Amino acid sequence: MEIPRQTEMVELVPNGKHLEGLLPVGVPTTDTQRTEDTQHCGEGKGFLQKSPSKEPHFTDFEGKTSFGMSVFNLSNAIMGSGILGLAYAMANTGIILFLFLLTAVALLSSYSIHLLLKSSGIVGIRAYEQLGYRAFGTPGKLAAALAITLQNIGAMSSYLYIIKSELPLVIQTFLNLEKPASVWYMDGNYLVILVSVTIILPLALMRQLGYLGYSSGFSLSCMVFFLIAVIYKKFQVPCPLAHNLANATGNFSHMVVAEEKAQLQGEPDTAAEAFCTPSYFTLNSQTAYTIPIMAFAFVCHPEVLPIYTELKDPSKRKMQHISNLSIAVMYVMYFLAALFGYLTFYDGVESELLHTYSKVDPFDVLILCVRVAVLIAVTLTVPIVLFPVRRAIQQMLFQNQEFSWLRHVLIATGLLTCINLLVIFAPNILGIFGIIGATSAPCLIFIFPAIFYFRIMPTDKEPARSTPKILALCFAAVGFLLMTMSLSFIIIDWVSGTSQHGGNH
């Protein structure tokens, strides 16, 4: 029997259900509900596999990526530059409020993945944009594709911004230079272009996400090393740093001498004690960035369905376990990195945690290794994040065309070119966290999964007033409220000029 070619969207069975691994698909379906023909969209064609040892079944086309590799892929899709901004978020919320918000965002992210998987199971669609088309037609598809594109361009921009800002510091440390030299290899703009062309682009040209699982595991190892270093440095970095206390007291001269005298005479340093006391609940103008930073840090939803498609022996339960495990691992890493980063610098922490360590010792070997690890991690993450953006472009512009390597290469090259231009002219990384986290992230996490589920789930199974659908609508309303509030506060912060964007370079 000839097996139909499949891409991100698999067969719709006649009764509208996603029968996991039970239904032969050789017979054409009779479902008249709205869907799009994606058999010519070559973006995903290379990773859907056939089982050679038995009759073709529904899941035989789904791929060969293992459970562990899928966890690596999804964890790496979650993990990114957002981890560097969480200590700054904690400094502007306090430990207790931060923990509450982080837990809420993690749980809501898991619930939204549940809605996505349930929706895809009903109609047999494995692409985020196609769920939008199935629910609302072309406007839904375009809205989903636009949100995915904006989110992932923002994510890749933040990754490349880290390369732009941190790689010159690494080279400066290796060359043992007190001040950056005015040469091309110390210019972050040249370096980010060089890394994009020599490392990121070749990885981005792969047609299978599964192969990137090995780089995913390596980059996750780099971030674990980053976390260990942050925890270790908490007990090595003195508090307060001389310049932090000087800023707090206005005494920019003789600060170290004054501290030493106070210690010798047994006098309490009230300024130091105040600076080095953690806050448990804080509200200020920068608190508006907290939820966008967290939302930005947990977005992985466009990658869930492609990873589900490539999963070996896929089922909704198995993919939900993968999602829950990935979110749980990232939740622990995020909280520990934020906590120990905050307890190291307190209110002196910058929006990019790693840059704050340059105030301690620019030539510290451990921090140098951490910088290298983070650079490797974000560099290897870019190709995974680029995949759904390219797929969205394929879905919008080249729906019914055969796969073309030329188009495949041109899309990746064009995307990286545009992102490099954004990074070269971007003033800071906090703006990327804030805007993307307050616009596309709430759409992808809260609003779209809920309204897609509400429209796709048949009313004969779940009436419009059923508890699951009411919860889904409430979920969408919460997302819209968070998006509106966060974006409003951020704009007010920009207009008032009170934003203190740490970590600029």
UniProtKB/Swiss-Prot annotation:
Expression sites (tissue/organ): Expressed predominantly in liver, moderately expressed in kidney and brain, and barely detectable in heart and muscle. Within liver, expressed in hepatocytes. Not detected in testis. Expressed in cells of the ganglion cell layer, in soma of some cells of the inner nuclear layer (at protein level). Expressed in the inner segments of photoreceptor cells.
Composition skew (Basic and acidic residues), residue ranges: 33-43
Disulfide pattern: 239-276
Alphabetical list of Pfam families matching this protein: Aa_trans
Protein's cellular compartments: Cell membrane; Basolateral cell membrane
Listed transmembrane segments: 82-102, 105-125, 143-163, 186-206, 212-232, 288-308, 325-345, 367-387, 409-429, 432-452, 472-492
Described function: Symporter that cotransports specific neutral amino acids and sodium ions, coupled to an H(+) antiporter activity. Mainly participates in the glutamate-GABA-glutamine cycle in brain where it transports L-glutamine from astrocytes in the intercellular space for the replenishment of both neurotransmitters glutamate and gamma-aminobutyric acid (GABA) in neurons and also functions as the major influx transporter in ganglion cells mediating the uptake of glutamine. The transport activity is specific for L-glutamine, L-histidine and L-asparagine.
Record protein name field: Sodium-coupled neutral amino acid transporter 3
